[in-house]
Regions:
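Short periplasmic/luminal acceptor-recognition loop of GT-C membrane glycosyltransferases, typified by
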Residues: 351-440, 449-456, 482-483
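Membrane-embedded transmembrane-helix bundle of lipid-linked glycan/lipid transferases
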Residues: 1-371, 377, 416, 470-473, ...
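A short, acidic, amphipathic alpha-helical segment used as a generic capping/interface helix at domain edges
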Residues: 185, 439-444
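Generic structural signal for beta-strand residues in well-ordered domains
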Residues: 172, 406-407, 445-446
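Generic recognition of flexible, low-complexity loop/linker segments
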Residues: 177, 296, 400-401, 441-442
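Aromatic/acidic, Gly/Pro-rich catalytic loop(s) in extracytoplasmic/lumenal soluble domains
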Residues: 443-488
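Terminal disorder- and signal-encoded targeting elements
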Residues: 1, 345-350, 382, 434, ...
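Extracytoplasmic/secreted cell-surface and envelope-processing proteins
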Residues: 138-140, 190, 423-425, 461-465
Length: 488
């Protein structure tokens, strides 16, 4: 009796044109929304607290700085917040949840329209991709990247159908491509090179026009942002650009954590699929992932970001590789294909869910075992901003105490970690927050006769010089505030 309803449900999903899209979209929305709800009332994402919230709340003040940093996405969020009178935090969170949902639709559409998969297998592909660490990590705080990647996937999907699509859809494709290059420099570069490569393969007039328009616009953007962009290549030749974080061991471990489990099936999917237009960005991002071999110990080419982007494209081929292996009975742990799909999918769902929803110190998150190596490139879980959520609560209490304490009067200088700058800008009242890459050196300069030092107890990093008198003014579970006075 139970087989009939199951069969009917399977038939509805297999034959329906709208329900599969709704299923995939709903799963993606639920996954990304849960991570926001679990963290409430605190935001998640390093750039959310240190970039998006401060910039949107003080947009005019920040505009001279961000105007040459590909500001399309943050400007869009600001416009939505102003036009609809919605609090910036809500706009930021809602936007990434929706973008994540549309990203899942892009993956499903690729499965249906390019890989010629049926609805059930396209659903498998979509779920497989959205639960990957690289995708979730990007949605954690790299919102511009996630937005631009989603548009890029749709653009490449439509371009692969040229010349079989209408002029209107070609115009839509051009628009999506333009917005993508406006949104993010790295993804814009990736899309531009992919478009050039696809134009050589297809040799279509309409595609050539689209490519020409996109390349011209992206070139103008690069020219307009020349000073900001030119800084990266200059770092390569500088002896001062050595960055211990970007050492080969760390980057190799990051690459393996992101991609090792995906590579075997990814190679199968790469060989078996005809997704030439998606193979181009995969290969480009692979090259970017290993720029550290030629230019070691420098962040100039952002190899960690390229590793994440490579993993996102690899997950598409890896998912298709698993489908191919299951359909060809190369993976046959069960006599039923559906069970084999579930056997593959469930571990990835577990790993992705643990990363999205578990506390920062949870034993469920196996990535914590590699924290020593990959910690500088991202969080152990998504339940984190620039500090952990419990530390966020404690920090707000400390800031409230500072704002209301008579000793830390208005005009006082508060020194602290650069990771706290967003919190301080948003919450600290009538006081100056001071931070630097090295606060110890800043104190040693003796520029400040009297100030306060706010330290995170779990990782105190500032050494107080001997020529400063220090007095503990405030202490909590996570933070200590010291009053410092220079001895003359």
């Amino acid at each position: 009796m139970n087989k009939v309803p199951k069969l009917q449900i399977a038939n509805v999903i297999t034959n329906s044109k709208k329900y599969p899209y709704l299923i995939v979209f709903s799963i993606a929305i639920f996954l990304r929304l849960v991570s926001e709800i679990l963290a409430f009332p605190y935001p998640i994402g390093y750039d959310v607290i240190n970039y998006y919230l401060p910039v949107i709340k003080n947009f005019e003040e920040y505009w001279p700085t961000i105007s040459n940093q590909f500001p399309f996405y943050v400007s869009l969020l600001y416009a939505i917040s102003e036009v609809f009178h919605v609090e910036p935090r809500s706009v930021i969170s809602a936007s990434i949840v929706l973008v994540f949902g549309f990203f899942s639709l892009a993956i499903f559409s690729i499965g249906r329209n390019l890989l010629r998969l049926d609805n059930l297998r396209s659903i498998f592909l979509s779920i497989f991709v959205i639960f990957q660490l690289a995708v979730l990590r990007t949605s954690w705080d790299l919102y511009k990247d996630m937005f631009a990647l989603t548009l890029t996937f749709f653009s490449l999907l439509f371009i692969s159908k040229i010349p079989k699509i209408s002029k209107k859809l070609i115009a839509v494709t051009a628009t999506l491509s333009i917005v993508s290059v406006l949104a993010d420099r790295m993804i814009g570069l990736l899309l531009s090179i992919s478009l050039i490569g696809s134009s050589f393969v297809k040799r279509d007039r309409d595609l050539a026009i689209v490519v020409g328009i996109v390349i011209v616009i992206f070139g103008l953007l690069l020219q307009a942002n020349h000073d900001n962009i030119g800084y990266n290549p200059k770092m390569v030749g500088s002896n001062n650009s050595i960055n211990e974080i970007y050492n080969p061991i760390n980057l190799i471990v990051l690459f393996l954590v992101m991609n090792a489990i995906l590579l075997p099936s990814g190679i199968v999917g790469f060989i078996r699929s005809k997704l030439i237009i998606f193979k181009i960005p995969l290969l480009i991002s692979a090259i970017g992932s290993f720029t550290w071999i030629i230019f070691p110990n420098t962040s100039a080419f952002l190899p960690d970001r390229w590793i994440v982007i490579f993993s996102i494209f690899l997950s598409l081929f890896s998912g298709y590789g698993f489908i191919t292996l299951i359909e060809n009975r190369r993976i046959a742990l069960s006599c039923r294909k559906l069970n084999n799909y579930l056997i593959i999918l469930i571990p990835f769902i577990f790993l992705g869910s643990a990363f999205a929803a578990s506390p920062n110190n949870s034993y469920l998150n196996i990535y914590g075992a590699f924290h020593q190596f990959i910690g500088p490139y991202g969080p152990l879980t998504m339940q984190y901003n620039s500090i952990s959520l419990p530390e966020s609560k404690s920090l707000l209490s400390a800031i409230d105490w500072i704002n209301n304490d008579t000793n830390t009067a208005e005009g006082s200088v508060i020194m602290g970690s650069k990771h706290l700058r967003g919190w301080m800008e948003l919450e600290l009242k009538e006081r100056t927050f001071l931070f630097a890459d090295n606060n110890t050196k800043l104190l040693a300069s003796n520029k400040y006769g009297e100030l306060y030092l706010l330290e995170l107890i779990s990782r105190q990093s500032t050494e107080i010089p001997e020529n400063y008198l220090q007095e503990l003014a405030y202490n909590s579970t996570d933070f200590s505030l010291y009053r410092l006075k220079l001895i003359k």
